[in-house]
Regions:
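Short, flexible catalytic-loop segment of classical short-chain dehydrogenase/reductase
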Residues: 92, 96-107, 154, 160
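Catalytic loop of short-chain dehydrogenase/reductase
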Residues: 3-6, 10, 14-18, 22, ...
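Short, hinge-like loop/turn segments at secondary-structure boundaries
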Residues: 110-113, 170-171
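Short C-terminal tail/terminal secondary-structure segment
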Residues: 148-175
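Generic structural signal for alpha-helix termini and adjacent loop/cap motifs
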Residues: 40, 141-145, 163
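C-terminal helical subdomain
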Residues: 28, 94, 112-147, 152-156
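Hydrophobic positions on the long internal alpha-helix
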Residues: 22, 29-37, 77-78, 135, ...
Length: 175
């Protein structure tokens, strides 16, 4: 989690030292791990490398701040390094999970309310952390050996929903 978020720094006032640390931990570390694996040539053919990301890399989410930037860079690293790994028949993907209450997530202002909103906006409901883990296992199987350089949404349909009847009904009830 971003130190800027944890310390309550607004995006327009962020601390750049903290930004750099978050960038290194949340994105650059993925490149570093893949680089070591590349140099040691330690991935099997049709192996899979995976990172978790979040839809805020592609959409605006207030108070997620520089984590959005970090996740966008993480996804870019997966695509770019994935191109090179493809030469060795290794897949590289990111999975964008539903909002999930974690220690880090609990530090985001208004996250509890957002969880409820995301549940209402997801036709299948929010995916749990365990369901995400199950999905990730499939990305290590031969069933997905031609899937690479993708950001795959595992969010109950949240990423594709403009609005749901559940959300409309809540606003209708208020009026």
């Amino acid at each position: 989690m971003s130190i800027n978020v944890r310390k309550g720094k607004h995006y327009t006032e962020m601390n750049y030292d903290w930004l750099e640390k978050g960038w290194d931990i949340s994105a650059v570390s993925f490149h570093k791990v893949m680089r070591v694996a590349w140099e040691k040539d330690c991935m099997n053919e049709w192996g899979s490398i995976l990172a978790l990301t979040y839809i805020a890399a592609q959409r605006t989410f207030p108070d997620y701040n520089d984590m959005s930037d970090n996740k966008a860079y993480l996804e870019s690293i997966a695509r770019t390094f994935g191109n090179y790994w493809g030469e060795r028949k290794v897949r590289v993907n990111t999975v964008s999970q539903s909002p999930t209450m974690t220690t880090a997530g609990s530090g985001v202002k208004g996250f509890g309310g957002f969880l409820g909103y995301a549940e209402d906006m997801s036709p299948l409901g929010n995916a749990t952390a365990l369901e995400c883990a199950d999905y990730c296992v499939t990305l290590f199987s031969d069933l997905t050996k031609k899937v690479t350089m993708q950001n795959l949404f595992h969010d109950g349909g949240f990423s594709s929903s403009g609005v749901t009847q559940k959300v409309i009904s809540k606003y209708d009830a208020e009026n």
